[in-house]
C-alpha cells in the first residue's frame, strides 16, 4: 500500500547522479559551505524527500494553507473541537482537554492517549481525618479509636507500653499512672499536695498581731518612728515576736504614715 520502492528516482537518482529538472538545492555546495571543484555537482531531486513524495492515501489531511515553501509541510494544531481559551487559573475541565499537538512533532497516539497519574482524591483521606478528629475530641473513648489513631499512638517516641495502658477509659481528673507515659512527663508531685503548689519549701503560715502587740508597737512608734537594734530586741522579747517581725512592722507603719500625709496634702490643694 504505502511502501516506498527502492527503484524510485528519489533513491536511485541520488546514487547514480541523475539530473532532474525539478531539483531546487544548490548543487555545488558542501555541507560545511565549501565547494568541490573536482567532483561533478550532485543534486537532490524533490522526489528524494520522503515527506514530499508520500502518496495521497497515506498523507494526513492538512488544511489548504499548511503546505508552503516548496512542498514542506508546516506543523499545525489539530484538535477535534475549537481551541479552548481558558485562563491559567481555570479548573473546569481536565488539563488534557486544552492541549493540542502537531502531527509531526507529537508522540504516537499510544503515548498521547495515556493520562497523567492524578493525585489521591480527598475522599480517600476522609478516614484519616475522621480518625484524627476522634482522637482529638473523644477523650473517654480512646480504646474505641479507629485504626488510624492507633498508628498515631504507636508512633509516639515513648510508647513501648503506652498502647497497653490506653486500652481503658482515660480519666483527666486523676494523675497519670502509666509507666510508659511517666518517662515522658514531668516528675509527679508527692501525694497530698495540690497541683499549684511547688515541690520546694512550704510557705510559712501568717501569724496576725494581737491587739496588745499592736498597741505596744503603736506607742513605741509615737515615741520614735525609727527604732534601733537594742530597742527592737527589747520589744521582740516583751511582745513574744521575732526581730524580723518588729522590723517589718515599723517599715510598714512608716509607709502608711507617708501615704496619709500625701493624701492630706493632695486634698488641701484641691
UniProtKB/Swiss-Prot annotation:
Family matches, as InterPro entries: HD, HD_metazoa, Homeobox_CS, Homeodomain-like_sf
Major localisation: nucleus
Subcellular location: Nucleus
Residue ranges for the DNA-binding region feature of this UniProt entry: 202-261
CDD domains: homeodomain (cd00086)
Record's keyword terms, sorted: Developmental protein, DNA-binding, Homeobox, Nucleus, Transcription, Transcription regulation
SUPFAM superfamilies for this protein: Homeodomain-like
UniProt similarity note: Belongs to the Abd-B homeobox family.
Protein name from the UniProt record: Homeobox protein Hox-D12
Organism: Homo sapiens
UniProt lineage: Eukaryota, Metazoa, Chordata, Craniata, Vertebrata
Recorded name of the encoding gene: HOXD12
